[in-house]
């Protein structure tokens, strides 16, 4: 038994959308009178042609199922809702398809890209766009007056309600500006204008990927506004424009100015209309360089310029100067000279210090000046206060001598020249050099080759300075290391294993061991010159055994500073001295005589 193709389609439910291909006459011949359930009346098909409705009572009362069969034609496979609202046909296969439903555009709005991609265009290929929306407008107008049958589902009611939504305002196009000919639409006047920003260089990918943001409206989504931008092809690869793109009509067409070129010289350079410092006179000289008295041309303050020569340094910047700068930057004390700044020239480096009028050696070379016991006590106290601070910070000066102790006219004392200073590791395995400290102020352990020493070496040098204040001249004056040891042994006695057990372990002890033992004659020599407290203090400071020497803090607690009279008194007599007295200047004056 053979069936026609139309019959097979009807049985399988896959007949093409033939409703839109047949004319009205063919429909009436196949289905007869179109009956609509409108309160028990029938509506003839001619009523649509004459635009007038003829309502008559139903001629026969039959079974409801028979009436429904007569109401809808047998050769029409789509549902009553599809026929009533004249919407495109959806097959059973498409109904079972999962995912979002294809969007059906409402009257007055052109179809969106999703409409063309969903296949709805194929199902309505027999209709032009004008006819399609004409039928949609008729169906929507009829839906507003016709009752909704109980069989209507929620999706149908939502589609009807969506037809009454307000259409979005049309976009306002602008003239092409600085965006490579792109049409930029501005937002409606109701919304605040966006902040203009610097336009960026667009690429070919930016031109191809355009979105709804460029036209001033939100991005297309199913169930929301769908509109068409003339002369622009919308695609699913829409991307928002760059955040720096301006969306207002006030966008400037000018290209931003290029960045300025980097300067040819250093970025941070300080220049002055005149030299920052003017040299007045030379006040010192040594192996490192020269020291000048200078004036600050801006503030008028006196400073000391320590010039470091670099032309003779084959290995670069002197390590002693590096240590001095590093240590002075960490020290802040009233009895330590202050480093103001560092100035660099082509072949030299200047270290700028605060200016002090004298140094201790230059003052003691002046035969007309004599310190009182109160002045000596005040100066000695300042020496140990500075040492207590240095040792507390873990710094060994290692070059305490008269020329490195500065004085001003008010009697203030400050330590200077930290070129040989270093941080103390406080370790028994420390290995320092013993070629430090000027020979006259060098302790006996260094003269015997000790390399693991501590703060006791500075205490010995300070004891020599105190004795120099009492006597007015250096206390131990030797020609070399051997003669220096002999001078020390003559005054303080020779060391032995009982008084200094560690002396036998020193490298040069056996080599420089004295032939005969000598006893100390320090007390007998100074018992008529110094007070008992001063003798006791100096004898402890100049002990041969470094472990028997007191610390700087213990020295300040000695009765010489705490209870013995006279009390410490500032050396104001320095104000009566004419000019500045430094060691280099004092020796220069003597040579002229």
UniProtKB/Swiss-Prot annotation:
Compositional bias segments (type: Basic residues): 90-103
UniProt enzyme class: transferase
Keywords for the protein's UniProt record, in alphabetical order: ATP-binding, Kinase, mRNA processing, Nucleotide-binding, Nucleus, Phosphoprotein, Serine/threonine-protein kinase, Transcription, Transferase
Extract the CDD domains matched here: STKc_CDK9_like
Q: Where is the Protein kinase domain?
A: 277-561
Q: Where is the composition biased (Polar residues)?
A: 1-17, 29-51, 160-170
- Sites where Phosphoserine occurs are at 56, 58, 104, 109
List of residues binding ATP: 283-291, 306
Give me the Gene Ontology terms describing cellular component.
chromatin; CTDK-1 complex; cyclin/CDK positive transcription elongation factor complex; nuclear cyclin-dependent protein kinase holoenzyme complex; nucleolus; nucleus
The record, for InterPro entries, names: CDK, Kinase-like_dom_sf, Prot_kinase_dom, Protein_kinase_ATP_BS, Ser/Thr_kinase_AS
**Which residues lie in Low complexity bias regions?**
139-152, 198-215
Q: List membrane-spanning regions.
A: none
Q: Which GO terms describe its biological process?
A: mRNA processing; positive regulation of transcription by RNA polymerase II; positive regulation of transcription elongation by RNA polymerase II
Family that this chain belongs to: Belongs to the protein kinase superfamily. CMGC Ser/Thr protein kinase family. CDC2/CDKX subfamily.
Q: What is this protein called?
A: CTD kinase subunit alpha
Q: Which organism is it from?
A: Schizosaccharomyces pombe (strain 972 / ATCC 24843) (Fission yeast)
């Amino acid at each position: 038994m053979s069936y026609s193709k139309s019959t097979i389609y009807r049985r399988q439910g896959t007949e093409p959308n033939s409703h839109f291909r047949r004319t009205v006459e063919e429909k009436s011949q196949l289905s007869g009178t179109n009956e609509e359930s409108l309160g028990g009346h029938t509506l003839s098909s001619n009523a649509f042609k004459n635009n007038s409705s003829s309502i008559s009572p139903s001629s026969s009362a039959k079974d409801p199922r028979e009436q429904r069969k007569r109401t809808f034609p047998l050769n029409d496979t789509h549902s009553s809702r599809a026929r009533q609202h004249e919407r495109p046909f959806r097959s059973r296969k498409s109904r079972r398809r999962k995912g979002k439903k294809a969007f059906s555009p409402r009257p007055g709005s052109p179809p969106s890209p999703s409409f063309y991609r969903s296949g709805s265009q194929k199902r309505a290929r027999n209709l032009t766009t004008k006819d399609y929306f004409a039928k949609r407008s008729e169906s929507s107008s009829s839906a507003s007056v016709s009752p909704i049958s109980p069989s209507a589902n929620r999706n149908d009611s939502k589609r009807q309600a969506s037809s009454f939504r307000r259409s979005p305002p049309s976009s306002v196009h602008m003239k092409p500006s600085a965006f490579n000919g792109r049409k930029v639409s501005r937002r409606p006047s109701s919304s605040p204008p966006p902040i203009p920003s610097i336009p960026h260089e667009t690429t070919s990918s930016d031109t191809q990927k355009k979105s709804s943001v460029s036209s001033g409206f939100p991005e297309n989504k199913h169930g929301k506004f769908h509109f068409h931008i003339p002369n622009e092809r919308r695609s699913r690869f829409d991307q928002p424009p760059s955040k720096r793109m301006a969306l207002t009509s006030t966008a400037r067409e000018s290209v931003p100015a290029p960045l300025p070129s980097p300067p040819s010289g250093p970025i941070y350079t300080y220049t002055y209309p005149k030299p920052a410092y003017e040299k007045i006179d030379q006040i010192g000289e040594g192996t490192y360089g020269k020291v000048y008295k200078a004036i600050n041309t801006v503030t008028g303050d006196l400073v000391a310029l320590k010039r470091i020569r670099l032309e003779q340094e084959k290995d670069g910047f002197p390590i002693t100067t590096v240590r001095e700068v590093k240590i002075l930057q960490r020290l802040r004390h009233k009895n330590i000279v202050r480093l103001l700044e560092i100035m660099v020239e082509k072949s030299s480096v200047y270290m700028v210090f605060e200016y002090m009028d004298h140094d201790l050696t230059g003052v003691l070379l002046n035969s007309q000046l004599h310190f009182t016991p109160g002045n000596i006590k005040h100066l000695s106290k300042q020496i140990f206060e500075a040492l207590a601070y240095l040792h507390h910070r873990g710094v060994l000066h290692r070059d305490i001598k008269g020329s490195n102790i500065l004085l001003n006219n008010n009697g203030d004392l400050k330590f200077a020249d930290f070129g040989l200073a270093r941080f103390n590791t406080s370790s028994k395995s420390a290995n320092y050099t013993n070629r430090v400290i000027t020979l006259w102020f060098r302790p006996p352990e260094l003269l015997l080759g000790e390399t693991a020493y501590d703060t006791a070496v500075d205490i010995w040098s300070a004891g020599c300075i105190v004795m120099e204040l009492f006597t007015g001249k250096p206390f131990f004056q030797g020609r070399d290391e051997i003669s220096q040891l002999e001078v020390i042994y003559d005054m303080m006695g020779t060391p032995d294993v009982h008084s200094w057990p560690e002396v036998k372990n020193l490298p040069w002890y056996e080599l420089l061991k004295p032939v005969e033992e000598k006893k100390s004659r320090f007390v007998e020599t100074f018992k008529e010159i110094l007070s008992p407290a001063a003798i006791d203090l100096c004898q402890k400071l100049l002990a041969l055994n470094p472990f028997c020497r007191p610390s700087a803090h213990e020295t300040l607690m000695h009765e010489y500073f705490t209870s013995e009279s006279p009390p410490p008194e500032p050396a104001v007599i320095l104000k009566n001295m004419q000019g500045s007295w430094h060691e280099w200047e004092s020796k220069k004056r003597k040579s002229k005589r």
